């Protein structure tokens, strides 16, 4: 095996792609700042107990583990940054009011999510802590849509769900809650026959529960799905509140293309309220996922309402129209103080200046040199090529 090969699911980022990713990162973090979000940068590696606090087994399976040679304790390479940012809010900042935090950093997965996924993601996201009302959910969703618009994603579609719908059904039927994992998997796959088969094997599962689960698998479509859910789902405690929360968001976003999928319950064990995914034209999977997760910070000794989102910046950049090559000024190499001063002034003004090294006058790179710095009448001036 050649020593230039990388492990499966990992890849180098070459100059043109790296430039596009970095441009996006700067644009998006600047956007988040205009909303009042503060940037934080947690470490790549933490004690495993901290990384996996109040998260499901899925994150545990995705986390690469190693032994700390200083303490002997098990460390984890982060597979998601949300719990780290939650720890910062709950334990380090310890603010009483609303806190808005954003972040961007690499995460590593022990296994790829699917055949088309990378094991190393550049995760960027934003979180609001300290407000339990729908206003925080709405602000986060508005920021998501602004994020994709800034990146140039066309025809973005918002898909809404609410973990409270599933929780209301499980709370009303303890027997169903014992099989929550299997039931949620079947619901995500819209597997109505599979739900019926599982229901036939589970003793004591209520008839209302079976009907509700089978109805959930078909409750996806436009905003009218909420009204249909009110008719078809049981009026158990918590159900009306969850559907009301979805309706409030729909009513607050009249200009957004959206759908409702009450079977999108992938984060049931983690989320505590509204959840969402956003899809873009020509992408095979959701570009952004997020939602409310009020219970996670309890593991850090301070329960706080929380809602947020994250996305993979590499995946986003790879699906966008390639950026035009950067325009640059070509300059000769030399030790003339006047030339050095002219190059310095151009660079300070934001221009890219590529000085041609001796013997490499025909070299190619990612820049398009449409101007050159030339000596005219004893002065270094920029002229168009």
Curated annotation (Swiss-Prot):
Pfam families: tRNA-synt_His (PF13393). Gene3D superfamilies: Bira Bifunctional Protein, Domain 2. InterPro entries: aa-tRNA-synth_II/BPL/LPL, HisRS-like_core, HisRS/HisZ, HisZ. The keyword Ion transport does not apply. It comes from the Bacteria. One of its GO terms (biological process) is histidyl-tRNA aminoacylation. The keyword Cytoplasm applies. It is found in: Cytoplasm. Keywords: Amino-acid biosynthesis, Cytoplasm, Histidine biosynthesis. Its main location: cytoplasm. GO terms for cellular component: cytoplasm. One of its GO terms (molecular function) is histidine-tRNA ligase activity. Pathway: Amino-acid biosynthesis; L-histidine biosynthesis; L-histidine from 5-phospho-alpha-D-ribose 1-diphosphate: step 1/9. Required for the first step of histidine biosynthesis. May allow the feedback regulation of ATP phosphoribosyltransferase activity by histidine. Belongs to the class-II aminoacyl-tRNA synthetase family. HisZ subfamily. NCBIfam families: PRK12292.1-1, PRK12421.1. This function is generally fulfilled by the C-terminal part of HisG, which is missing in some bacteria such as this one. Heteromultimer composed of HisG and HisZ subunits. This is ATP phosphoribosyltransferase regulatory subunit. It comes from Bordetella parapertussis (strain 12822 / ATCC BAA-587 / NCTC 13253).
